[in-house]
């Protein structure tokens, strides 16, 4: 399965203001090589991934991520096998332990992930090591990602984390971080948009603990995030500035980046921004 260099990450409705535009098909036509979306917080594998696959012809569709608390390994394995029957070798399963505030009983997440992977291996369908990635942040989960999956899909991370992740994974594993983009050159507007996006994640201990491990302190995490934190986690500015910041992840060891655009106005899919970004990012 060839993931390519640049994918997009989007968890809200894949619907443009112009309803005649099929967003997934257009992203493929623009040259993005993978479409990532959240697996949600409900049992089962969302049927939405099948819709993305049906709307496209060759891009990889990936879950970023499916939480292991809501669906059994057997059910998930069967759902992925059903997708693979219809769209062979085009679905990449991203798995994660999610976050304690979102899970009713959140105990021993690392051990639970190990057991989950064991069960997927026993199921012997299509969710083999090379067809899955883990949402690794900390060293233990990153090590597990390298040992038991194709690699890691970290979310809400600066390039410094990409450097660390590559060191832990070694040279043979996939590293595909989510990278947040705000295509706005005004610093005040850009950081305001970034902070609105970041608010959800700064309330989740897995993310804040990870940021602390990278040297960010209480002052950085308070008040929606310091300028230093915003500038580290979010690539903002004009096109050249954004591409330069995204390139830092490649230089730090990323094989593939999953670009999540924060819209400059609330509403539908940021189609204009992804159109503007595509030629520059694909040439980076």
Model-derived regions, located:
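Active-site-adjacent structural elements that line small-molecule/cofactor binding pockets in enzymes
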Residues: 1-284
């Amino acid at each position: 399965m060839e993931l390519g260099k640049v994918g997009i990450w989007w968890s809200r409705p894949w619907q443009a203001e112009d309803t005649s535009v099929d967003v997934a098909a257009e992203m493929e036509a623009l040259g993005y090589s993978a479409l990532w979306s959240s697996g949600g917080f409900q049992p089962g594998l969302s049927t939405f991934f099948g819709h993305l696959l049906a709307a496209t012809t060759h891009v990889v569709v990936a879950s970023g991520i499916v939480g292991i608390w809501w669906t059994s390994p057997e059910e998930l394995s069967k759902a992925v096998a059903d997708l693979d029957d219809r769209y062979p070798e085009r679905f990449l399963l991203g798995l994660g332990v999610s976050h304690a505030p979102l899970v009713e009983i959140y105990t021993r997440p690392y051990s639970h992930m190990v057991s989950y992977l064991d069960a997927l291996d026993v199921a012997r369908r299509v969710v083999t090591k090379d067809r899955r990635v883990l949402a690794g942040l900390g060293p233990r989960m990153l090590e597990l990602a390298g040992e038991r999956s194709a690699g890691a899909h970290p979310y809400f991370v600066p390039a410094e984390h990409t450097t660390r992740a590559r060191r832990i994974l070694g040279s043979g594993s996939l590293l595909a971080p989510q990278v947040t983009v705000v295509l706005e050159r005004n610093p005040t507007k850009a950081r305001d948009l970034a902070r609105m996006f970041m608010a959800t994640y700064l309330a989740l201990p897995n993310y804040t603990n990870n940021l602390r491990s990278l040297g960010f302190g209480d002052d950085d995490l308070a008040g929606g995030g310091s300028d230093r934190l915003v500038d580290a986690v979010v690539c903002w500015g004009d096109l050249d500035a954004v591409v330069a910041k995204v390139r830092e992840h490649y230089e730090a060891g990323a094989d593939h980046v999953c670009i999540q655009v924060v819209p400059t106005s609330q509403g539908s899919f940021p189609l204009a921004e992804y159109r503007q970004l595509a030629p520059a990012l694909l040439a980076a």
